[in-house]
């Protein structure tokens, strides 16, 4: 009983093994390379020649696959090593460029741009100061010009009044001394009378002067004074004697002296104003020059800083462009290396597949030649033409 079971088991094992061999043959036959090998083997079987030479050829082919794979492995290892070196160099370059980019950006944002803002503010401040001092200087000069014009007008008014009073005094003095205006044949103590013509002349002089001085901008009181003198002149014929007229002359002298004193005070005040103006103007000019010098220095510093900023920005642009270029080169190189890896893997798989086919075929020829012959014959009977 045990013998029967063992025999059945052996039969089942043989049947299973033969089935596996047939599956292997069919699998090999499905590949173009395997079909070519089987076609070659079938031709050899048809000639009846020993298959030793074919087995030797297949063995050499298998060995060549192994050698080629080793050579390919070495080339791939060398190529991937070069890829690693290149990628590492790109990464190092990118790291250095990014570090430089960060430094440049930090210098711009943390140092140069704030400095520029400060200098721009300083320039604006100094421009405002220069403008303010220049305005003060212009206003000071304008005020001085206005004061001088006012002074000249006052001097002219004083001079006009002096001329008017001096002329009136002359008329009084000349006519009181001229015998043609004094009635003769009377004692010296008798009153001296002015003629009507003299009175009219003096009255006209003061009336005209009153109208003229009414246009004065500063000493408008002269007009009233000269109107009063005109009234006095209209009554000059009624003056009792030359002593009364002399009082008028003395009054004129007193007025002339007061006008002279007033003019002296006016000139003194003008001198003080000029002195004060010169001092004030000197202070403003000094402040203007200091502010102008500070402005020039600030503008120069700003221009120099802008040059530095332009250089740093240009360096930053160059660095950013380098990062883009190196990144693109790294991507291209990485892609090449990955494609090479894929090509190597595909070639290795294809070579391994062909090697497996050769190895399996050698095994079939050496161990399962009968089954292989039967399957090739069946394939031939099925219509497969070699």
Curated annotation (Swiss-Prot):
Source organism superkingdom: Eukaryota
Signal peptide extent: 1-19
Propeptide: 20-48, 184-238
Gene: T2B
Keywords: Coiled coil, Signal
Cellular-component GO terms for this entry: trichocyst
Coiled-coil intervals, chain numbering: 51-154, 294-325
Organism name: Paramecium tetraurelia
Stated family: Belongs to the TMP family.
Cellular compartments annotated: Trichocyst
The keyword Coiled coil is annotated on this UniProt entry: yes
Record's function text: Structural protein that crystallize inside the trichocyst matrix.
Protein name per Swiss-Prot or TrEMBL: Trichocyst matrix protein T2-B
């Amino acid at each position: 009983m045990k013998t029967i079971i063992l025999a059945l088991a052996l039969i089942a094992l043989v049947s299973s093994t033969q089935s596996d061999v047939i599956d292997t043959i069919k699998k090999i036959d499905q590949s173009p390379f395997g079909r070519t090998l089987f076609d070659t083997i079938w031709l050899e079987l048809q000639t009846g020649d020993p298959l030793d030479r074919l087995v030797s050829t297949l063995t050499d082919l298998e060995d060549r696959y192994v050698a080629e794979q080793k050579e390919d492995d070495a080339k791939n290892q060398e190529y991937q090593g070069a890829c690693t070196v290149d990628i590492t160099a790109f990464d190092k370059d990118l790291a250095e460029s990014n570090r430089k980019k960060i430094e440049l950006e930090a210098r711009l944002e943390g140092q140069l741009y704030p400095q520029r803002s400060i200098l721009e503010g300083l320039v604006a401040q100094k421009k405002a100061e220069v403008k303010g001092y220049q305005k003060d200087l212009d206003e000071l000069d304008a005020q001085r010009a206005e004061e001088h014009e006012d002074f000249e007008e006052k001097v002219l008014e004083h001079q006009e009044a002096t001329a008017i009073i001096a002329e009136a005094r002359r008329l009084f003095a000349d006519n009181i001394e001229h015998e043609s205006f004094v009635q003769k044949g009377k004692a010296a103590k008798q009153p001296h009378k002015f003629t009507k013509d003299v009175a009219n002349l003096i009255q006209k002089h003061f009336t005209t002067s009153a109208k003229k001085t009414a246009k004065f901008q500063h000493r408008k009181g002269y007009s009233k004074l000269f109107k009063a003198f005109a009234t006095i002149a209209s009554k000059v014929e009624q003056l009792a004697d030359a002593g009364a007229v002399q009082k008028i002359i003395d009054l004129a002298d007193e007025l002339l002296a007061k006008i002279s004193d007033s003019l002296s005070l006016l000139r003194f005040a003008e001198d003080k104003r000029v002195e004060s103006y010169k001092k004030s103007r000197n202070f403003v000019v000094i402040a203007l020059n200091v502010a102008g010098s500070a402005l020039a220095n600030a503008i120069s510093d700003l221009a120099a800083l802008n040059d530095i900023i332009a250089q740093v920005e240009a360096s930053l642009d160059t660095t950013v462009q380098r990062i883009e270029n190196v990144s693109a080169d790294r991507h291209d190189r990485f892609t090449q290396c990955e494609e090479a890896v894929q090509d190597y893997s595909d070639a290795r798989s294809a070579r391994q597949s062909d090697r497996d086919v050769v190895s399996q075929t050698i095994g079939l020829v050496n161990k399962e030649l009968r089954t292989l012959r039967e399957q090739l014959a069946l394939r031939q009977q099925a219509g497969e033409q070699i």
